[in-house]
Amino acid sequence: MNKHQCGMIRMPYIAKKNLEKCRQCGFCDEIACSSAYVGYAKECTGCGACSIACPYEAIQMIEIQNGKSISITLDGAIISVLERVTIKKALEMCGYEPCEFPGDGNLFSPCRTGGCWSCAVLVNGELRPCCVTAVKEGMYIDTKTEVTPKRPVHGWMGHAVGGVGTPWRLKKLSGFIETACFTCGCNFQCAQCQNWTSTYNGREIALTPREAALLMSDSRRTYRVDRMAISGGECTLNRKWLIEYLRELKKKNTDDKARFHVDTNGSILTPDYLEELVEAGMTDIGIDLKSLELDTFTHITGVMNRELATKYLETAWNAVKYLVDNYPEKVFLGVGIPYNKDLISLDEIQKMGDKIRTIDENVQVCVLDYRPAFRRSYIQRPEYEEMVNVWRILSGTGLKTVICQTARGHIGPEI
């Protein structure tokens, strides 16, 4: 068998902590890093996940010069690549096209942290995310064989409030109203991420759809609820996994009371994906519309590629309209809007309300009061009076069901 030299050389990197910025929080070593620990020269894959995940931006990726070439087998062909680059980089050197929107390339790898496993390939017979797994001498990589998908999921819990896609009447009840779990990995890099320990988690155990469905069904029995929600991170990134998970969950919960709730940013929910979700059993969905304007969207989400950001933003808005037009009775839809004066203006909030009203004045709209978190610890959580004002603005557009999350609990649809 001949050895092939792949194309453009991609030098390996190693992570290095900037001790002047580092606060010793341990997140990079204990949660984000998929190898031993950040900066461990022998095992560092140079993937950059720790750098993306550090709340203090204290990790730099340093290029390593004069890397040694090694041999790996890719789909039966022996190829030569630099050691300690990720499999994703090796695949890119061999002609694969990584992308962050489905169909823009042939290697969908949106999270870059090893959280979503959309890019997983067989490595020596074991499924591994190629974005954080380093090549090693003699490694056998199989990108062709179809296998049962896996994805890291955690945090099964009872939820007393629910999410954007939870009907507002249930939010008034006491006790748990649904059970939820959280997938790791996200295609956004929100500096104020409200759930960043899931978004940047690279160490959680990956589960098959059936394993996750069993745990969710057990959680339903534990908390004695009928609603089962999956959130994140961003739960829709690994499409094959999510569809199989919903099908497995529906098989294990065949009663009429069971509700299957998907909580999402909607950024890749094309019509064919939505159709597949409905067919798989989805009964409720909450879609977070981050903004109306592109500049606001990039500011909130950290997606700086404007072409990609435009696709994400338009896809989410289109998903809302598609569900309203095609499944007004079959699928309960809730729309989420973020609010913090440092992130989005009241004028844009009103324009979002106007646009949602033209789609459906009766759709449930839930405004989320973004609190200080992750890299935007300096922002202030909106005051109660601010959220009352937001409620009045949105209700004034003609929307009939506006709910606002506040430090004192939810307000609306009437106050």
Model-assigned labels for residue ranges:
Residues 51, 108-147:
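Glycine-rich phosphate/adenylate-binding loop and adjacent beta-alpha elements
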Residues 44-64, 137-153:
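Short, structured interface segments
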Residues 384-415:
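A cross-taxonomic marker for long C-terminal extensions/tails that follow the last structured domain
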Residues 14-17, 23-41, 49-65, 118-128, ...:
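Iron-sulfur cluster-binding cysteine motifs and their immediate structural context
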Residues 65-78:
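Eukaryote-biased recognition of intrinsically disordered, low-complexity regulatory segments
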Residues 4-14, 80, 84, 96, ...:
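N-terminal [4Fe-4S]-dependent radical SAM core
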Residues 210-377:
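Conserved AdoMet/S-adenosylmethionine-binding subsite of the radical SAM
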Residues 15-16, 42-44, 92-127, 176, ...:
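Immediate flanking context of iron-sulfur cluster ligation sites
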